[in-house]
A protein has these predicted regions:
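Catalytic core of non-heme Fe(II) oxygenases with the double-stranded beta-helix
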Residues: 59-61, 65-191
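Non-heme Fe(II)/2-oxoglutarate
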Residues: 1-80, 84, 119
Length: 191
């Protein structure tokens, strides 16, 4: 499974502390979707951290999620266009051309060691199924499908370079754990 990689101790202690402080204290101020062209210098701390990790070879999409709720099984793609279609027309255009990033990175910024649940689920053998919607609330893994389970840990990162279906479980002990903070970013060849 060369298309899925896992790294530990991704950031040095100072960078990690600064990133945690920024994401946890300013989460509400961070736009939901962010994009940076490969020719642009970083406009903010998040872009600085990401560019230090992956360089400037490709365009960059990134977002932060500090949430204890589940996300449905999905693939990373041109979701923004699908959301615009839903807003304008009430549904995703079934004929919309699906575009996928070169890769997806999930950097765990802050994970409480007491967290129960909140695991990342990846279907390592299931790429996007042509004809399905990007924002597909009806997708369910077929019985017997292989699912890789990743227990998030602070300063660890998961990377995959195929449009794989993935999801996040609900954190089950939200009486104790208030944050499950991750920085996600994807490289794009074209805009």
């Amino acid at each position: 499974m060369d298309h899925i990689q896992y790294a530990k101790n991704v950031l040095d202690e100072g960078t990690l502390n600064n990133l945690q402080q920024f994401c946890l204290q300013h989460y509400e101020e961070i736009p939901i979707y962010n994009f940076a062209r490969k020719t642009e210098k970083p406009k903010n701390y998040l872009e600085e951290v990401i560019r230090d990790l992956i360089g400037y070879d490709n365009h960059l999409e990134y977002w932060v999620r500090d949430d204890t709720q589940a996300t449905l099984m999905h693939v990373d793609a041109n979701e923004l266009q699908a959301k615009i279609d839903r807003y304008k027309y009430g549904e995703e255009d079934p004929h919309m051309i699906k575009e996928f990033p070169l890769n997806t990175h999930i950097l765990y910024v802050f994970i409480d060691p007491k967290m129960e649940g909140g695991k990342l689920l990846i279907m390592p053998e299931q790429e996007y199924i042509p004809g399905r919607k990007i924002l597909d609330t009806t997708f369910r893994p077929a019985e017997g499908s292989k699912i890789m389970v990743v227990k998030p840990e602070t300063n660890h990162m998961v990377l995959f370079d195929k449009p794989l279906y993935h999801a996040v479980e609900t954190v089950t002990n939200t009486d104790v754990v208030k944050h499950r903070c991750a920085l996600m970013f994807s490289s794009w060849k074209k805009i």
